[in-house]
Structures are given as structure tokens and as C-alpha cells.
UniProtKB/Swiss-Prot annotation:
Reactions that this protein is recorded to catalyse: 1,6-anhydro-N-acetyl-beta-muramate + ATP + H2O = N-acetyl-D-muramate 6-phosphate + ADP + H(+)
InterPro entries (alphabetical): Anhydro_N_Ac-Mur_kinase, ATPase_NBD
Protein name: Anhydro-N-acetylmuramic acid kinase
Top enzyme category: transferase
GO molecular function: ATP binding; kinase activity; phosphotransferase activity, alcohol group as acceptor
Pfam name, any one: AnmK
PANTHER family assigned to the protein according to its UniProt record, in alphabetical order: ANHYDRO-N-ACETYLMURAMIC ACID KINASE (PTHR30605:SF0)
Classification of source organism: Bacteria, Bacillati, Bacillota, Bacilli, Bacillales
Keyword Thylakoid carried by entry: no
List of residues binding ATP: G9, T10, S11, L12, D13, G14, I15, D16
Length: 382
């Protein structure tokens, strides 16, 4: 089957689309990436998403309209990846669309029950591309008592399980998440959970203090020094003390967190603040490894992926934090995979599993009561 996986994450960089060919289903799936592209959001669309994400500034009329606008954006992104690959849209069998997360409530709080909302109307995508769309991957896991995240572990087992090596896959997108993948000869369980901020705080600080979308290659962070006072404040965040399985998002580490941090520590240089929040991402990752993984698993390899793996300063901070451990640290590209395409490929794989009616959540990662088939299916017009 030819499937387009579509992902728009918490970083708001744009729409990632992976065109893949998948043979079979389940753990024996054969997956080949044909082409990958990122379609940036228009400035007006990005502004509307940012407004929709704000509890103070959002409204139901905006979210209702944006749901359909993003459906068109996602459909156009699928057309773009096919055009770039010189691949006929009519050959496409399936689209797996994650959607744009507007709010994620992983656990009950007050009178709010656990819930999640991703928008980007699948009916619009299906109609505009004349292709079956699978979307809303998180909701069934949450209906089964899970947190709806992380969802990539299933695809990571298919792609990265090694005959003899125990691996950690660390994704560094807007949020960081880790998947523990025991070797094929191991009888230990796959586990996964969010490790805290990935690029989210780094990018927000860059935009506010340097008027740059992100810290390219970590060049600015390399110039500053870590401020212990700020790092201690960050590392005391309640999320870091929670036991897995757990998930987080912009609600905990987004604009409000950055606003409070910058107001509290405005006396420090902007370079030192950026260096410190970069160290916070690295330290939160290392903290979770040492607290929740390394005491129980003998890890041979750590594989870093996502946009954060291109931040050389961040990667070196992670390496330094793990210098006393026996594991070898790689970037996805070191082993022949694409850091950028990883999550989009994951949702193509999940769409394939749903098409074949196979459960594809990992209860040990999400906390769900049972394995369930993920996603809603939307057929194109006849």
C-alpha cells in the first residue's frame, strides 16, 4: 500500500508529510520511505493556530473555522509530497493524519476529564484528495483509559527492533519522548513516555529574545553559560517527579511557562537563558533515563531523532549527561533513518494498522487498559 503520513506537531514548524510504501502489517511490515517534505504554514494560519492554543484568546468560532482550514492545508501538503515525488495522487491508497493538537488533557483535573482535541477535518482531506483518511489516533487509547500518548512506540518497534541490542529511541520534537525497545531475544516489555520539553522552550525563547524561529545547530546556546539558579527552577517542575507512563505538552511547557521564566530571571543575559533552557531539555532527558530506565534495562544504544537532534549543543549536552553510561549515542541519520520524517512515517504505519484492524497502541506506554485499534476512518465521496 502507498500511504501518506501527515504530522503537524507542537513546534508549529509546518506540515510534515511522508510518502511511504508498506507491505504487510504488524511486526512483519516492510516500510520504505519514498519521499518526505515539510510544507511551512502560511503566517496567517500559524497565527490562528497560536491563538487557538491560547486559553485566554481562543474561541469556538475560530477553532471551528480553523478545523476546516487545516483540513485544506493537510490535503494540499499531501498533493505537494506526491508532486515532488512525481507520484500520481490517484495511486495513493490511504492518508494517516495526526491533526493539529489544540489541547491535550492526559489526566483528570478538577472537573475536567482526560481528553484530547486534534483538528484538521478529515472529511475535507478525504474529499479534496479522493483518498480514505484515518485520523484521531489518540482518542480510542484515551477511551480505554490511556493518556493518548505516546503513540509512536508501535511504529518504532517495527522499524528499530534489533536482534541483540537494547535500544532507546529519543524523539526531540516540541516535546521529548523516549521509547525503550528491548532486543528480539529479550523478554522485557516495550515502554515509552514523554520526557518533558524538546524544542518547545528553546524555540519560544529564541523567538522572544532573538527574533529567530529557532537556534540553528545550537550556535547561540554554545556561546552562553548555564545558570544554575534557572536550571534548578526548571528541574523542579512537577512533571519530572511523576512516574511513567506520562505525557505532557504545550499546556505545561508552552508560552505561559516561558513567560514566567523570563519575568523571573530577566536579570540574566539572553544568551545564558537560552543556554540554560537548552540544558534543561538535555537534563530532563538524562534525568528520566537514570531514574526510570537504566536501573531496569541494560541499554546498548541511544538513538536521537526529531528536529532537536540537529541542535549540536543540545546533543553534546545529552552526551555529557550520559558519559558514565555504557551506551553508545547515535543520531537517526547515523543508522540510515531520517530524523525529520520519523513521526510522519509513524502515522503512515499506524494508518496501515488501522486499515488492517490491528491494535496499535502500547498499553505499557500509554497506561491504557487494553490494546485497541486506533483512529477514525473517513471515506472519500463515491
Amino acid at each position: 500500500m502507498y500511504i501518506a503520513g501527515v504530522m503537524s506537531g507542537t513546534s508549529l514548524d509546518g506540515i510534515d508529510v511522508a510518502l511511504v510504501r508498506i507491505e504487510g502489517s504488524g511486526v512483519d511490515s516492510k516500510v520504505k520511505l519514498i519521499h518526505f517534505t515539510t510544507v511551512p504554514f502560511r503566517n496567517d494560519i500559524k497565527s490562528e493556530i497560536q491563538q487557538a492554543l491560547s486559553i485566554e484568546n481562543s474561541n469556538v468560532q475560530l477553532i471551528c473555522s480553523l478545523n476546516f482550514k487545516l483540513g485544506l492545508c493537510f490535503a494540499n501538503a499531501v498533493k505537494e509530497v506526491c508532486k515532488e515525488a512525481n507520484f500520481s495522487l490517484e495511486q495513493l491508497d490511504l492518508i494517516g493524519s495526526h491533526g493539529q493538537t489544540i489541547y491535550h488533557q492526559p489526566k483528570p483535573e478538577g472537573n475536567m476529564i482526560a481528553s484530547t482535541l486534534q483538528i484538521g477535518e478529515p472529511a475535507v482531506i478525504a474529499y479534496d484528495t479522493n483518498t480514505t483518511v484515518i485520523s484521531n489516533f489518540r482518542t480510542m487509547d484515551m477511551a480505554a483509559g490511556g493518556q493518548g500518548a505516546p503513540l509512536v512506540p508501535y511504529s518504532e518497534v517495527i522499524l528499530y527492533r534489533d536482534p541483540s541490542k537494547n535500544r532507546l529511541l529519543q524523539n526531540i520534537g516540541g516535546i521529548g519522548n523516549v521509547t525503550v525497545i528491548p532486543s528480539q531475544k529479550s523478554d522485557q516489555n516495550v515502554i515509552a513516555f514523554d520526557t518533558g520539553p524538546g524544542n518547545m522552550i528553546i524555540d519560544e525563547v529564541c523567538q522572544r529574545l532573538f527574533q529567530l524561529p529557532y537556534d540553528q545547530n545550537g550556535e547561540i546556546a554554545e556561546q552562553g553559560e548555564v545558570v544554575d539558579e534557572i536550571l534548578t527552577y526548571c528541574m523542579n517542575h512537577p512533571f519530572l517527579k511523576m512516574n511513567p507512563p506520562k505525557s505532557t505538552g504545550r499546556e505545561q511547557f508552552g508560552e505561559e511557562f516561558v513567560s514566567q521564566l523570563l519575568k523571573r530571571y530577566e536579570k540574566y543575559s539572553k544568551e545564558n537563558i537560552l543556554t540554560t533552557v537548552t540544558m534543561f531539555t538535555a537534563s530532563s532527558i538524562v534525568h528520566h533515563y537514570k531514574g526510570f530506565i537504566l536501573p531496569y534495562y541494560e541499554i546498548d544504544e541511544v538513538i536521537l531523532g526529531g528536529g532537536g537532534s540537529y541542535n549540536d549543543t543540545l546533543v553534546e549536552m545529552i552526551r555529557y549527561g550520559l558519559k558514565d553510561e555504557k551506551c553508545t549515542i547515535f543520531i537517526q541519520e547515523d543508522i540510515g533513518y531520517s530524523s525529520e520524517a520519523k513521526e510522519a512515517i509513524a502515522f503512515a504505519i499506524l494508518a496501515n494498522e488501522t486499515y488492517h484492524r490491528n491494535p496499535s497502541n502500547v498499553p505499557s506506554a500509554t497506561g491504557a487498559k487494553k490494546s485497541v485499534v486506533l483512529g477514525n476512518v473517513t471515506y472519500p465521496s463515491i
